Structures are given as C-alpha cells and as structure tokens.
C-alpha cells in the first residue's frame, strides 16, 4: 500500500471507531430528541399521547416501552455512523488538499477559513449520498413507540428497509434527501471548518491540551447544531411520510413541510428537541477530540 492509502485507511478507522463509541453513549438523548421532533408527524403518537418535553419523554419511555427502548434504532445508527463519520473525516482531508493547496493560514486567513468551510461541507454531502437509507431507517426505528410484537411498526433495521422499499420504492428510502443535503452542508461546514480553523490558529495544535480541544469542539458542535437544526426537523418530518398513502400524507413536499410547520405549530416547532441536541453534541465534541487522540497513536 502507498503512504497515501495507509493514511486514508487510518483516517477511516480512527474516525469510525471514535464515532461508534460516542454514538452508543448518547443514544438515549438521541432518541428523546427524535421523538420530540417527529411526534406531530407520527401515526402512532396521537395528540393526547404526545410528549410535553424532554423530562416527560425521559420519564415515559421506560414506563411505556422499557428501559432498553432508549437504544431503539441505535444499531442502525452505529452501522450508519461508522461509515458516515469515517468517510467525512477521510474525505475532509482529501477536500482540504483541493481547497487549501498552497494557502498560508497565517497570511491568507479568510481564504484558509473559506477553504475549511468548503472542505467540511463537501465531505458531509458526499458521504450522505452513500448512507442516507441507513439514516432514514434509524429515524423510523427511533420513532417507533410500539411496546413489542404487533404494536411495533418495524421489527428491526432489515424489516424497515424492506417494508418501505416495497411500499414506496427507492424514493421512499431517500425521502427528505434534498433538505438533508442543505442541512448537512451547513452543519459540516461549521463542524469541520470552524474547528480546524480554531485549532490551526493555536501556537502548537498537535500538542494542545485535551481539555482545550474539548472546549473548542463543544462550542463548535453547539453552534453548528443549532444553526442547522430547522433543516434537521424538516428532513425528519419528511422521512415520516414514507409508507403513507392518499389522505394520510401530511406534507406534499419539503416547501410544504416548512410552510405547514410554521403555520400550524409556530417557529418554535423547528427547534423541538434542540436542547437535547446540545447535550447530544457533547458526544460529537468527544468524537472530534477522540479522533485527534487516536491519530496520534496510529
């Protein structure tokens, strides 16, 4: 293998392992966030059974579905997240070579900053094309509030993908893809761009204390998450449309979804579950720091 291939493989492995560990740790927060986001578009959750907020959700889930249900959809998330993050991190460096070749970060700061934004956004959009059906399945499994057996909408990851494919075709597995690309570019641009720029401005980036790295990463994930959150809410709502027919369809398209949420639920609805998303972001910050630490030993 060439040095470039070895470097690519190390990036892929380090990013994937770090992501899988952190995602499993914050899976309960992730499920709470998803339920709050999509409950208005769920056929299973009627108006009288909707969750009032994070606390109500955390209290009711173990009572109604069991403690292990906090990790519902986590397997799909780990399977999805491993290649997603690994591809993001690996392609990020490839895109950096394209956008940042010959750029001096000390004398060409804004060009350096713009290059980091572009490389982060392009990496996120590229990987999304490959793993979107897994992201779709993770959302639908997490939104499934049935206790067990016949009450469940899907038996598992494979069952979810097969049922939606049979009812809606490949299009059903990519429901909400367009708005996802918009959101992922905004999120990844901030996630990678600001983080790399901030670290690059430090006196000795490779020997920065892990606490400083974590603080930078935490701030970046919080800002990036809140900035792109409305796009995430719309894409999750669109994912819930797959499998519906006729009068069951709530939104005719992405623009209709934006319009109806704003009209019927108010602008605050775009940020439902946002606070739990900030908490979940601690896992994202941990990924960035852990990735840098793993690379030091590979």
UniProtKB/Swiss-Prot annotation:
GO terms for cellular component: mitochondrial inner membrane; mitochondrial nucleoid; mitochondrial permeability transition pore complex; mitochondrion; MMXD complex; myelin sheath. The modification N6-succinyllysine is found at residues 43, 105, 147, 155, 268. It holds the Pfam family Mito_carr. Residues 1-7, 100-109, 200-210, 292-298 are mitochondrial intermembrane. The modification N6-methyllysine is found at residues 52, 147. Keywords: Acetylation, Antiport, Chromosome partition, Membrane, Methylation, Mitochondrion, Mitochondrion inner membrane, Phosphoprotein, Repeat, Transmembrane, Transmembrane helix, Transport. The keyword Transmembrane applies. One of its GO terms (biological process) is negative regulation of mitochondrial outer membrane permeabilization involved in apoptotic signaling pathway. The matrix-open state (m-state) is inhibited by the membrane-permeable bongkrekic acid (BKA). The cytoplasmic-open state (c-state) is inhibited by the membrane-impermeable toxic inhibitor carboxyatractyloside (CATR). Proton transporter activity is inhibited by ADP:ATP antiporter activity. ADP binds at residues 80, 92, 235. Residues 235-240 are annotated as: Important for transport activity. Gene3D superfamilies: Mitochondrial carrier domain (1.50.40.10). Disruption phenotype: Mice show an apparently normal embryonic development except pale phenotype, but show a reduced birth rate. Postnatal growth is severely retarded with macrocytic anemia, B lymphocytopenia, lactic acidosis and bloated stomach, causing lethality within 4 weeks. Mice develop anemia in a cell-autonomous manner by maturation arrest of erythroid precursors with increased reactive oxygen species and premature deaths. This is ADP/ATP translocase 2. It comes from Mus musculus. The gene is Slc25a5.
């Amino acid at each position: 293998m060439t040095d470039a291939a070895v470097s690519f493989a190390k990036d892929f492995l380090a990013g994937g392992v770090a992501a899988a560990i952190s995602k499993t740790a914050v899976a309960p927060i992730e499920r709470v966030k998803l339920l709050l986001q999509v409950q208005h578009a769920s056929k299973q959750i009627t108006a009288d059974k909707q969750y009032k907020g994070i606390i109500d959700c955390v209290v009711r889930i173990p009572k109604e579905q069991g403690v292990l249900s906090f990790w519902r959809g986590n397997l799909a998330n780990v399977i999805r997240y491993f290649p997603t993050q690994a591809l993001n991190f690996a392609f990020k460096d490839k895109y950096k070579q394209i956008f940042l070749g010959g750029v001096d970060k000390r004398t060409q700061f804004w060009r350096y900053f713009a290059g980091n934004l572009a490389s982060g956004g392009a990496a996120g959009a590229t990987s999304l094309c490959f793993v979107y059906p897994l992201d779709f399945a993770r959302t639908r499994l997490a939104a499934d509030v049935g206790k067990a057996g016949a009450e469940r909408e899907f038996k598992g990851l494979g069952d979810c993908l097969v049922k939606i494919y049979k009812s809606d075709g490949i299009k059903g597995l990519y429901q909400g893809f367009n708005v996802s690309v918009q959101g992922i570019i905004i999120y990844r641009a901030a996630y990678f761009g600001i983080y790399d720029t901030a670290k690059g401005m430090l006196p000795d980036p490779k020997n920065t204390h892990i606490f400083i790295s974590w603080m930078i990463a935490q701030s970046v994930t919080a800002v990036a998450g809140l900035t792109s959150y409305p796009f995430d809410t719309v894409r999750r709502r669109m994912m819930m449309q797959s499998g519906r027919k006729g009068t069951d369809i709530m939104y005719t398209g992405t623009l209709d979804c934006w319009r109806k949420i704003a009209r019927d639920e108010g602008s605050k609805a775009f940020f439902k579950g946002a606070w739990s998303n900030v908490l979940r972001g601690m896992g994202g910050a941990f990924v960035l720091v852990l990735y840098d630490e793993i690379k030091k030993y590979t």
